[in-house]
């Protein structure tokens, strides 16, 4: 019976991707080995990947989006779009929804997780990404703020309090 379950799962998984959710702590290597970025790229389909980059957490989304676009293009990406979402209503843009239909990888950059959350949370666009990730249709990665918004509970701020030391 387990073999049938395994075969059923294999049929559901997009053959272009290795289903993955990569939660990257931040400060990933963007210059030398780029190992974690290369892992995402490979799991999203490598040169056959169709990637979406969401730099909305950044104060400078154009610069951040362009940086990751160049990185993935240098790895061999041929089909790639930067989702320039700066207002919640931008999530309703049909071009993003249409592009996600054949997307094999979504990468969310670092920055301010509260900004990213306020732009994407509970939008049809984010729901489409979530459903695709759950169904194994895309590799989903986020670094720093992009990683923080993937969890059910997210730390959005705080203050440094007194440190308790057990003596």
Locations of regions flagged by a protein language model:
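Extended, subdomain-level signal for the structured scaffold at the beginning of enzyme domains
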Residues: 2-115
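Class I SAM-dependent methyltransferase SAM-binding "motif I" and its flanking Rossmann-like core
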Residues: 18, 109, 115-167
